[in-house]
Amino acid sequence: MSGGGEQLDILSVGILVKERWKVLRKIGGGGFGEIYDALDMLTRENVALKVESAQQPKQVLKMEVAVLKKLQGKDHVCRFIGCGRNDRFNYVVMQLQGRNLADLRRSQSRGTFTISTTLRLGRQILESIESIHSVGFLHRDIKPSNFAMGRFPSTCRKCYMLDFGLARQFTNSCGDVRPPRAVAGFRGTVRYASINAHRNREMGRHDDLWSLFYMLVEFVVGQLPWRKIKDKEQVGSIKERYDHRLMLKHLPPEFSIFLDHISSLDYFTKPDYQLLTSVFDNSIKTFGVIESDPFDWEKTGNDGSLTTTTTSTTPQLHTRLTPAAIGIANATPIPGDLLRENTDEVFPDEQLSDGENGIPVGVSPDKLPGSLGHPRPQEKDVWEEMDANKNKIKLGICKAATEEENSHGQANGLLNAPSLGSPIRVRSEITQPDRDIPLVRKLRSIHSFELEKRLTLEPKPDTDKFLETCLEKMQKDTSAGKESILPALLHKPCVPAVSRTDHIWHYDEEYLPDASKPASANTPEQADGGGSNGFIAVNLSSCKQEIDSKEWVIVDKEQDLQDFRTNEAVGHKTTGSPSDEEPEVLQVLEASPQDEKLQLGPWAENDHLKKETSGVVLALSAEGPPTAASEQYTDRLELQPGAASQFIAATPTSLMEAQAEGPLTAITIPRPSVASTQSTSGSFHCGQQPEKKDLQPMEPTVELYSPRENFSGLVVTEGEPPSGGSRTDLGLQIDHIGHDMLPNIRESNKSQDLGPKELPDHNRLVVREFENLPGETEEKSILLESDNEDEKLSRGQHCIEISSLPGDLVIVEKDHSATTEPLDVTKTQTFSVVPNQDKNNEIMKLLTVGTSEISSRDIDPHVEGQIGQVAEMQKNKISKDDDIMSEDLPGHQGDLSTFLHQEGKREKITPRNGELFHCVSENEHGAPTRKDMVRSSFVTRHSRIPVLAQEIDSTLESSSPVSAKEKLLQKKAYQPDLVKLLVEKRQFKSFLGDLSSASDKLLEEKLATVPAPFCEEEVLTPFSRLTVDSHLSRSAEDSFLSPIISQSRKSKIPRPVSWVNTDQVNSSTSSQFFPRPPPGKPPTRPGVEARLRRYKVLGSSNSDSDLFSRLAQILQNGSQKPRSTTQCKSPGSPHNPKTPPKSPVVPRRSPSASPRSSSLPRTSSSSPSRAGRPHHDQRSSSPHLGRSKSPPSHSGSSSSRRSCQQEHCKPSKNGLKGSGSLHHHSASTKTPQGKSKPASKLSR
């Protein structure tokens, strides 16, 4: 039938077949043949004429005729009218039906059916399946497009089974089940095929029931986890790994019986149809469904007549290019191998013959099932009326064909169009939005309504459509229940999938960032929730309304979304999964790092969702308990390789590494994948705007980013400041992190503009990740955090804290991390964005703006000074960025050194840092809880924290033992200390002020010290972080900054030399990184200090016990101890051959950095390759620089350690440059660790 039919119509309008059926129009066509609307000249009724070419290799109509004849007299089966053949074609004539279920579902505003409609349709479909099984045949292609509603008032509420072309007889002449074949070719439609079909096993009766189950889920959710995946093998793999019980949450509870039963069946076992029918009956009773209730597509017109609403003119059967769009039985086209069916098994007497045309002898037309006899022509074709009304009614979604997995080429004919022979009455004024009726129907039954509501709120297990449907439902709920979400959603909440995001959904192409559908959110369908693809609003949690707006990550800005989409296009498919497009709303869940990890998938999904929607609600469970959403996301991760890659490793370490390798790639240097980074940041970007609301949700995001995405997210965050107030905050953070580094970050941020806004809290997470990761991670963390700060700018909390001190620390740690690990180097590459000085300068300007905004709250002058310094550092960093581009890993190391160097410069620019500190302190006051939470997340991931060699060793030790449990414990410990952290933040604020007055060198040292330890310390406590910062600053400056120091020394950009005690610098830095209460609230220094202490504990301890003990110490000691810890901890990263923290920043600048002395701090962090290349090498050589797996040491006197670290850093710098750098790194690890941690904290 595909022979001549594909190019030229087999029949033309006006042709008379067998001198009885006059062709009126073509209503469908596909691989199997064509379907025509014909007029029966004998009965004067419209019929469906299905034709296949006689030259077609696989003859399908023989089986169709055989089965159709066997089924005559059964309910839900079209009336057979006639058949025949000639030299040109074979044909079958049957009763013409109305719209198919696939088209009807897509016509709904949400792309879903209510429970009421789903249950009644499901029961009818089950009856039709039982009917075909009763005659010894399997349908083998059960799907929505193969079921259609009747055309006339008497039949419009009856569902008819269509398309028996793939049927197979499973019984022999004796009625016994035929033995199964060892290998049977795949038959059916990929989306709805059973696992047996994918395994090429002989299909049995239970396989038709599995397809029914998938249909029911799609009816309720709007999509399946593998909806957009066309590859048969991939879909089969997903189905095998997917926990189908996750789908039950969308169905009535009774369907657990349905699933259990079909799961227990095999080829030979006869299904208990009575049991399955009782499931539908009981559910109908439970939800108060009334059989006479109108279906979702039916509405009551003004005249009281029942009208069916249709939104598309697509053929009745869309699957496999099904031409039976108007309910033409067996009208489904068969694509590809579907034609390879054993039609030769048709009984010999089932041949097509003209003699069989006509009504069977002895059977009056009136007695035929569904036959109304001659009066039928007088009956109104309800579907034609619907079509007429359709012309005057614009439906929100009409994406009929795209949804069918096999409908690559939809039937060209419009089966939905009114038949030429049937009367058409236009009653557009009568039709009402079909959305109203479902609502009324819901209100009729409390149970039904509640179920619908629950289904709406709950997240989809794995599918794009699942997610979309849930998202859409959530959108409604969100608009009603979440004002905070609505602003950013704009109408569509995006959810990082349970993925994200339930990774299974990731497999869905819809979940994939959908490079093919980057503008899906803009499409009318997506705007509607996507008739076929987009049900953007999805709340994984069944109690979405219970979630605070804080728990939602929202993207308010179209610009951000556009940027995100742009970024998605690049990294969309790299990190995203097919489910990226699927918008899903994740609620912030108080969950363990594992939960957050689970949410990585959701973020991937979020990327897609964000692409789809300008406004996305990203609610991830940062620290909340794991929920079904997170579980779903986990499933998605498992099912979605793409999603997994996007999220990288579920574990913090793998995540960080993956991000470093791929998404991390920033703009200028050969970074892993800018696209992936951008996509990640893009998703975060959506989350970032809601940052104010969602600090915790951001944590999971950070985890997602931690390997590489975190970096990209961080980079994006820094880039964010240019794009808005949030970005300004980011800029402030970045300024403090390292002016040189900041420009690079800004560049990357610009490229990843969207990510930051989505990453308000995620930035913080990234910061922690950054700590865990080598320098780049740190930088990314900083960026993310700063992005979060952006949102907090309005809050007046987070931004300043990170920008002033954390920035420098971040830079140092980044270099440190880069030295430690190659992956981290890729992360560091994100900082490499610096090469674009202009962009960096712009970023600095933005940062300046943000800083001024934040500092206006605290210390505007300092911020301004810092901004200026940042600009200088940007220049330096640009040159270093070039170096980094030349060397990814070495570049990252160089970035660390550069970062440290930049930190030194920043210290010179203490006034600016002071401003940043001021801003940070305010930010700390503004959102200490979120920041703390984010840090706690990082604590769990501290293993990824880039640390000096020693620090890495200790970090690895503590990290591996701490792992999820320790991280969770740390998180728990951290949360109780939020108040303390807040107090610490206040203390840090004052400390930041001290930093501003302190010499640049001290600041630089502090920053250098902070980087490695900062991640873990940051995770632990703000206070410990501060302590670690001072220690780390010294050690990190010594090791990390040693090259950076030389660079910073070389950097020609003059920087104000304001000396600040290392303790002060560290504590201020820490305070910057600590979450602050919302703007207007007094800063809480103690809380920050407590957090820093935690971080310090993480950084300094080699084991979990050490971490905990240190954490306790930090909590006890207060902000002073964190400061000292920072000094001690600051690992002497090879990049910090710089003089002790007190030494001027310039000395820190290494000769290699001299060309970029002004922007060296940035350069060292972002692009060590050029000026910080020696640093980069050092990083490579020194594991702690690359990454500190174990928390950097938090112990040690801050000043002494700093000095030691600096000294150590100098040798380390040389060592890093040389082969001995690794040794130096390890040697300096102890001292630098503390410093590195503070840097991490600061970066946060």
UniProtKB/Swiss-Prot annotation:
SMART domains: S_TKc. The active site is at residue 141. Belongs to the protein kinase superfamily. CK1 Ser/Thr protein kinase family. Keywords: ATP-binding, Cell projection, Cilium, Cilium biogenesis/degradation, Cytoplasm, Cytoskeleton, Kinase, Neurodegeneration, Nucleotide-binding, Nucleus, Phosphoprotein, Serine/threonine-protein kinase, Spinocerebellar ataxia, Transferase. GO terms for biological process: cerebellar granular layer development; cerebellar granule cell precursor tangential migration; cerebellum development; cilium assembly; embryonic brain development; embryonic digit morphogenesis; forebrain development; microtubule cytoskeleton organization. Changing residue 1110 to H: Found in a patient with SCA11; uncertain significance. It catalyses: L-seryl-[protein] + ATP = O-phospho-L-seryl-[protein] + ADP + H(+); L-threonyl-[protein] + ATP = O-phospho-L-threonyl-[protein] + ADP + H(+). The gene is TTBK2. Residues 674-683, 1059-1073, 1116-1130 have a biased composition (Polar residues). Transmembrane segments: none annotated. This is Tau-tubulin kinase 2. CDD domains: STKc_TTBK2. The modification Phosphoserine is found at residues 445, 786, 1103. Residues 674-694, 1052-1088, 1116-1244 are annotated as: Disordered. Residues 1075-1085 have a biased composition (Pro residues). Interacts with CEP164. Interacts with MCRS1; the interaction is required for recruitment of TTBK2 to the mother centriole. InterPro entries: CK1_Ser-Thr_kinase, Kinase-like_dom_sf, Prot_kinase_dom, Protein_kinase_ATP_BS, TTBK2_STKc. The lineage of its organism: Eukaryota, Metazoa, Chordata, Craniata, Vertebrata. The keyword Secreted does not apply. It is found in: Cell projection, Cilium; Cytoplasm, Cytoskeleton, Cilium basal body; Cytoplasm, Cytoskeleton, Microtubule organizing center, Centrosome, Centriole; Cytoplasm, Cytosol. GO terms for cellular component: centriole; ciliary basal body; ciliary base; ciliary transition zone; cilium; cytoplasm; cytosol; extracellular space. Residues 1145-1171, 1188-1203 have a biased composition (Low complexity). It comes from Homo sapiens. It is linked to Spinocerebellar ataxia 11: Spinocerebellar ataxia is a clinically and genetically heterogeneous group of cerebellar disorders. Patients show progressive incoordination of gait and often poor coordination of hands, speech and eye movements, due to degeneration of the cerebellum with variable involvement of the brainstem and spinal cord. SCA11 is an autosomal dominant cerebellar ataxia (ADCA). It is a relatively benign, late-onset, slowly progressive neurologic disorder. PROSITE patterns: PROTEIN_KINASE_ATP (PS00107), PROTEIN_KINASE_DOM (PS50011).
